[in-house]
Amino acid sequence: MIYEGKAITVKALESGIVELKFDLKGESVNKFNRLTLNELRQAVDTIKADASIKGVIVSSGKDVFIVGADITEFVDNFKLPDAELVAGNLEANKIFSDFEDLNVPTVAAINGIALGGGLEMCLAADFRVMSATAKIGLPEVKLGIYPGFGGTVRLPRLIGADNAIEWIAAGKENRAEDALKVGAVDAVVAPDKLAEAALNLIKGAISGEFDYKAKRQPKLEKLKLNAIEQMMSFETAKGFVAGQAGPNYPAPVEAIKTIQKAANFGRDKALEVEAAGFVKLAKTSAAQSLIGLFLNDQELKKKAKAYDEIARDVKQAAVLGAGIMGGGIAYQSASKGTPILMKDINEHGIEQGLAEAAKLLVGRVDKGRMTAAKMAEVLNGIRPTLSYGDFGHVDLVVEAVVENPKVKQAVLAEVEAQVKDDTILASNTSTISISLLAKALKRPENFVGMHFFNPVHMMPLVEVIRGEKSSELAVATTVAYAKKMGKNPIVVNDCPGFLVNRVLFPYFGGFAKLVSAGVDFVRIDKVMEKFGWPMGPAYLMDVVGIDTGHHGRDVMAEGFPDRMKDDRRSAIDALYEAKRLGQKNGKGFYAYEADKKGKQKKVADPSVHEVLAPVIYEQREVSDEDIINWMMIALCLETVRCLEDGIVETAAEADMGLVYGIGFPPFRGGALRYIDSIGVAEFVALADKYADLGPLYHPTAKLREMAKNGQSFFG
């Protein structure tokens, strides 16, 4: 062994060839943390000092190559002063450059995935050979930053500026054949031939068959584009990418600007340009929020994984109530490998459920994401039925009937009598108390809530609701089933609206107050979309359904009358009474028409103002900032209450629930991180300015205490 560390080893293979292997002890994947970087420095120095070494193969001892930097280190690193952060970045880059400058040829053997710093390590090698099943990419823009280990410098010099911009700005993973096509790798081989191919390639480079110095040289020089080509390439890309990313996600455009600024420099000067831009992005609130989201997501997955120890495997599922929701649940279950019975009380419901599943499957086949044979297999995994005949073998039943407590209780009691004693029953309710529904059951310990969001196939969140009598086994099994379905489960405790809807309705409450104060709902939508929401509150209410919103608001008002009950008629009441139910019947706040593709498109409908006139009680001067505050303060304070009440266990889960469940702007990180970004003390002072709007705007005593003590939700 030439070098041995905890993350990297260097050992002799044959004829002066050595293998530099990444294999981080105690971890399932390789990543660039401080330890790995320090050991890479030592390994490179060791190789450089050994004159007997003729070539280096870089490999991984794990199923993946390197997944990138250790994101957990970003939080503290990014708090460093700019100059210190730039110096640290350049010091790390010196390691990669020294590896690139070795007086012997180098080959990277890429298995599994090589992302971020993992791919940047490969780019520093002279040659890259890739397993046919591997994927490579630079996903840093998803964290609000761009590649910082030479990715913006080496990749454009290797595959051309246009291709590099596409890879870096999109941040996606790229398959082996695509990587070979653009020249990011030199060869693609079967996974079991990777080591052999890398060895043959390095031997060819040592013998002079392949000129490694000629291969290396373009990465050390300026970009081969003249001034006109640069202008056309970069200016066009900046305009297009800015339109795609939007103003709240600066990283993709900054990456292009960095490539452009460094285009006329050699490698070392170009790396300085990269470092300066990287640090600039690292200090943005978008980067801090998106990195926080990534870490929250990791925490969420870790918590969900902990339930695996006691969870039972769901081999056969069932859904009660077909229709669009039931069909969506059936599709999701069957497409992820769990066969499911789909029961309804009539043929129409069954037909609707099957049509929904078939529509989703056909869509995947049409886009080339699924074969016709796989589609047939998934459809065979959905068995429609009008009876309980086969329910004796079911492990978990999802009840998805109408949102009415009496109907749900009757259906749940009925199915409980038809299943095994240990079958888990889960209600897909959006607002009704699980403990209330459990009163109809003989085995309430086997009962939980399992709240899917619409449309099921697109929305990543599932709330798993623990009732007063729910067992940990029932909770764990439901969490495991949700994960198996490809969802991100969050366990919450029971209360009206659970987490997501309990927080969403105060947001809608703020919206209703604005309309009643004479603020045009179209203006409100525009302001909130500019703030970062995927759609404004009026449009969202139309999509959800005015009737659904009306019912949900009443449930929430009954559950929290002190702050959510409003005796005045509101815009929701006016539209509901006028039978303007939103997208579902073509008229809500907006009118809806089918476009050429048959997709519902919203259009202005002047007649709605007549409907809303009776619920406008004043004409108040309200700024755009006021609009944001009326809505966001109510939402944020209810999130704080959910955390304080123990409805959700951690700030991370609360924030992820809102990002995954209602599209809270990711670049703002979630409600609690949004409070942190303002400052807890500043947020409390801001809320106090709107105290006249009612109890929804009154900070809790605990939040005031946090403000007084200079505390935050995320350290």
Curated annotation (Swiss-Prot):
The active site is at 451 (for 3-hydroxyacyl-coa dehydrogenase activity). Residues 1-190 are annotated as: Enoyl-CoA hydratase/isomerase. The record marks 120, 140 as: Important for catalytic activity. Residues 312-715 are annotated as: 3-hydroxyacyl-CoA dehydrogenase. Pathway: Lipid metabolism; fatty acid beta-oxidation. NAD(+) binds at residues 325, 344, 401-403, 408, 430, 454. GO terms for cellular component: fatty acid beta-oxidation multienzyme complex. Gene3D superfamilies: 1.10.1040.50, 2-enoyl-CoA Hydratase, Chain A, domain 1, NAD(P)-binding Rossmann-like Domain. GO terms for biological process: fatty acid beta-oxidation. The keyword Chaperone does not apply. GO terms for molecular function: 3-hydroxybutyryl-CoA epimerase activity; delta(3)-delta(2)-enoyl-CoA isomerase activity; enoyl-CoA hydratase activity; long-chain-3-hydroxyacyl-CoA dehydrogenase activity; NAD+ binding. In the N-terminal section; belongs to the enoyl-CoA hydratase/isomerase family. In the C-terminal section; belongs to the 3-hydroxyacyl-CoA dehydrogenase family. Heterotetramer of two alpha chains (FadB) and two beta chains (FadA). Involved in the aerobic and anaerobic degradation of long-chain fatty acids via beta-oxidation cycle. Catalyzes the formation of 3-oxoacyl-CoA from enoyl-CoA via L-3-hydroxyacyl-CoA. It can also use D-3-hydroxyacyl-CoA and cis-3-enoyl-CoA as substrate. This is Fatty acid oxidation complex subunit alpha. It comes from Pseudomonas fluorescens (strain SBW25).
